[in-house]
Amino acid sequence: MYVAMNRFKVVKGSEQAFEDVWKNRNSSLSEMPGFREFHLLRGPLNEAEAYTLFASHTLWESERDFIAWTKSENFRASHRNAGGNKPLYLGHPVFEGFTSVEGA
């Protein structure tokens, strides 16, 4: 199993707009081989730096399936307009990928 996450620092006050982008997106993830599930996670508010931490979390059968998704036309189509949402978050999303430890 493979977990792919992107962490976003969402500008304080923009949380609902950020969530709406995800809720209203056209997703083709379920069409991709190896895709299991998606979750958008809301983390803590950092008052000092004025952002709320969010993470997009996808679960895949394997890292190979995830990489195939990133090279697919579906991936390109789903990220085509992502730049228009940059005012909602600080900096670039930070990617983290994890492979499950079998038997643990």
Where are the regions that the model predicts?
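Residue-level preference for beta-strand/loop junctions
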Residues: 2, 50-52
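Active-site-flanking beta-strand signature of metal-NTP-handling nucleotidyl enzymes
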Residues: 3-8
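Short hydrophobic/aromatic beta-strand micro-patches
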Residues: 9, 41, 57-59
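Short, surface-exposed ligand-recognition loops at beta-strand->loop->(often short) alpha-helix junctions
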Residues: 10-18
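Short amphipathic alpha-helical/adjacent loop interface patches that line ligand
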Residues: 22, 26
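An amphipathic, aromatic/His-enriched active-site/gating alpha helix that lines ligand/cofactor pockets
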Residues: 27-36, 51, 59-96
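Flexible, low-complexity linkers/stalks enriched in Thr/Pro that connect modular domains
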Residues: 41, 96-103
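Acidic pyrophosphate-coordinating catalytic loop
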Residues: 44-50
